[in-house]
Structure formats: C-alpha cells, structure tokens
Amino acid sequence: MSVATNPNHAGADREVGTQALNRELQDKGFLVTSSEDIINWARTGSLHWMTFGLACCAVEMMHTSMPRYDAERFGIAPRASPRQSDVMIVAGTLTNKMAPALRKVYDQMPEPRYVISMGSCANGGGYYHYSYSVVRGCDRIVPVDIYVPGCPPTAEALLYGILQLQRKIRRTGTIAR
C-alpha cells in the first residue's frame, strides 16, 4: 500500500478559471466575487458601535464623534442599544462588580460582534491593576479584537483602532468567525 505525498490541489483549477474569467470581464464592467467578500466589504463601511464608557477614556471616545474627528466619515456610527450594534468599545476601568453587566451586554449583541478595548485600564487594569476590585483587562470577560493603548488614548488613536478593525474584518471573514 502506498501513501500519496503530493500536495492537495483540489480547487486550484477552479481558482485559475475564476481569475481568467475576472480578467476577461474586467474591461466589460463586470466583477466576479463571492457573496462573503461582498458582505465583508459592506460590513466594514457600516459598523455601528456601542459605548461602554467607564472612566476618563469615555471622554476621548466622545471626541471621535464630534466634528473635529467625525468618525461617521469612516462608516462607523454610534448606537444606543446593544441589539443594534456590531462593535463595543470598552473604555475605562472595569470593576469586578461591573463585569457581569459587560458580559450581559456583549451577549445581547448580534453576531458577528467585535470589541475594542480602549485605554490602559480596559487593556490590563492600568493604574488600578493591583486593586482587589478591578478586572485586570476586559479580555478576561469578553473576547477583544483590537487594543488601543494609552492613558487616556487620544481620539486619533481610537480612530486608528477603528480603521484597524475595518481592515481586520476585510482580511478575515464575518460569516464564520
């Protein structure tokens, strides 16, 4: 009995055929793509974020919505309800007493959902890291996609984190997460 050690090329012919079809139709105004790519493209331009402001980082988070930075030009708009939002921005010190509320709000968000951890306190406890009542990073309660460092981070840093999240969504998939 012999074992085949050749690499698996299943689907390679289909990929080559799709690329050839794309080249042929490109000049005619058509585009061949998958529905998942279209969904990822649309989702990156229409993220709805929900604030979970717990401390001074929340003030900088508010600045991103003001006219100077205008986060809506990047396709991200604030929402008041977790059921209408795709992104949760955790900004500030997360205490042990507040952790169950954070998890409950996260569970109410529809899939796919993303979390941005903003500031040193949300990232790892910050100044209050050794306090008995502080969670040493919100990633112990909810899965975090993007970390924004700083104490408090600037509005520009948060905007950069939002752009990184959009890039991550485009690069990975939103359907199977």
Swiss-Prot record:
It is a peripheral membrane protein. It is found in: Cell inner membrane. It is an enzyme of class 7 (translocase). It catalyses: a quinone + NADH + 5 H(+)(in) = a quinol + NAD(+) + 4 H(+)(out). Binds 1 [4Fe-4S] cluster. Its cofactor is [4Fe-4S] cluster. GO terms for biological process: aerobic respiration; electron transport coupled proton transport. Transmembrane segments: none annotated. Pfam families: Oxidored_q6. Keywords: 4Fe-4S, Cell inner membrane, Cell membrane, Iron, Iron-sulfur, Membrane, Metal-binding, NAD, Quinone, Translocase, Transport, Ubiquinone. One of its GO terms (cellular component) is plasma membrane. GO terms for molecular function: 4 iron, 4 sulfur cluster binding; iron ion binding; NADH dehydrogenase (ubiquinone) activity; NADH:ubiquinone reductase (non-electrogenic) activity; quinone binding. [4Fe-4S] cluster binds at C56, C57, C121, C151. Its EC number is 7.1.1.-. NDH-1 shuttles electrons from NADH, via FMN and iron-sulfur (Fe-S) centers, to quinones in the respiratory chain. Couples the redox reaction to proton translocation (for every two electrons transferred, four hydrogen ions are translocated across the cytoplasmic membrane), and thus conserves the redox energy in a proton gradient. Belongs to the complex I 20 kDa subunit family. NDH-1 is composed of 14 different subunits. Subunits NuoB, C, D, E, F, and G constitute the peripheral sector of the complex. This is NADH-quinone oxidoreductase subunit B.
